[in-house]
Regions:
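Class I SAM-dependent methyltransferase Rossmann-like catalytic core
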Residues: 2-40
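S-adenosylmethionine/decaboxylated-SAM
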Residues: 19, 31-179
Length: 179
């Protein structure tokens, strides 16, 4: 049921002319991410790298009661469009979300949460920094682990914090659930 709900909602919610096209493979990616949230039903969540809000919408469909703190610097060429699209999605779907418009590398701490999604800076240093920002969060979902720098950051983070990562190939990008 959740998978179908996401498959129906995402294409309608997609930003027009987005360079990141919504296709069946992309939908499966968001379904896999939403399944993690559905399993834990967090009361609070942090999303580092919210861009257009596609993950946020998928998470909301999996756990509508979750309150989200989203962080994004919106520094790319399409950032203004993405930011406005994010605002529309949050309003249209009545998602409990607040956003901090800041480069996460400028942050030294974030509030406590039950779940975190790390999908911000895809460099080794950036991903490692973002993971350490949410180190006290019980469940962390790291995206883009098919990127060697991100995967190494996840592995090094787990080694230094004595946590475990379960990697999943969702057909688009590898995800890591860190517990």
């Amino acid at each position: 049921m959740l998978d179908q709900h996401i498959a129906d909602a995402l294409p309608k919610a997609w930003m027009r002319d987005d360079w990141f096209a919504c296709d069946a493979q992309v939908i499966r990616h968001y379904q896999a991410k939403a399944a993690v949230v559905a399993a834990i039903q967090p009361k609070t969540g942090i999303e580092i790298g919210t861009r257009c809000g596609y993950s946020l919408l998928s998470f909301h469909l999996a756990s509508p009661q979750t309150h989200w703190l989203c962080v994004d610097g919106w520094v790319d060429s399409d950032s203004m469009q993405c930011r406005e699209h994010w605002k529309r999605l949050v309003a249209e779907w009545t998602i409990h979300a607040h956003v901090m418009r800041i480069d996460s590398r400028k942050l030294t701490e974030l509030p406590a949460a039950d779940f975190a999604h790390v999908d911000g800076d895809h460099s080794y240093a950036g991903a490692l920094h973002d993971l350490h920002l949410v180190a006290d969060v019980p469940t962390i979902l790291a995206d883009d682990c098919d990127n060697a720098s991100v995967r190494q950051a996840v592995e090094d983070f787990c080694a230094s914090t004595k946590r475990k990562a379960a990697f999943t190939d969702d057909g688009l990008r590898q995800l890591a659930v860190i517990t």
